[in-house]
């Protein structure tokens, strides 16, 4: 009967933890040996600079609380260059036909924001162009916003569109005495 309860305890996780601690020591020893071999390989390859982990990598490699002393791990990570050179480019495009839509999508794929002015196109081709570019924007996890009649803003996933600007402008307008009109159709306030 006691063996049944000990099996239940082991299954639930209330069993004797000493068995698991012994296994952990074996794995640590194997891991240390693999680490030494990896460091030796890097040193012979001449990439000793890549063997020093960053602070973020050290923090993420720390052992969980209660598992004993924290161990440092050295990872062989790949550094991926970011294509953005710090300059965000916004293109204003006024296409004349649907055939220009793939070029617009290519700009989005190149991580450039596009303001699309479709007022020069007939309505059927304009609708077709918007559908095409909107579908491509969705496919690359981009964002879109209608700015005005026939004018749309399409951005890649690295650019977020915020519609909070009007409330910020209202606050700034109130801070300067409320003399600026945010809505051109709104009647002007009399200056007092």
Curated annotation (Swiss-Prot):
Protein's UniProt keywords contain tRNA-binding: no
Name of the gene this protein is made from: sepF
Protein's UniProt name: Cell division protein SepF
Annotated GO CC locations: cytoplasm
Cell compartment(s), UniProt: Cytoplasm
HAMAP family attached to this UniProt entry: SepF
Function: Cell division protein that is part of the divisome complex and is recruited early to the Z-ring. Probably stimulates Z-ring formation, perhaps through the cross-linking of FtsZ protofilaments. Its function overlaps with FtsA.
BP GO annotations: division septum assembly; FtsZ-dependent cytokinesis
Biased composition (Acidic residues): 18-28
Assigned keywords, A-Z: Cell cycle, Cell division, Cytoplasm, Septation
Protein's organism: Gloeobacter violaceus (strain ATCC 29082 / PCC 7421)
Region (Disordered): 15-70
Biased composition (Basic and acidic residues): 29-42
Highest taxon listed in the record's lineage: Bacteria
Skewed-composition ranges (Low complexity): 43-63
Keyword Cell inner membrane: no
Assembly and binders: Homodimer. Interacts with FtsZ.
Family: Belongs to the SepF family.
Main subcellular location: cytoplasm
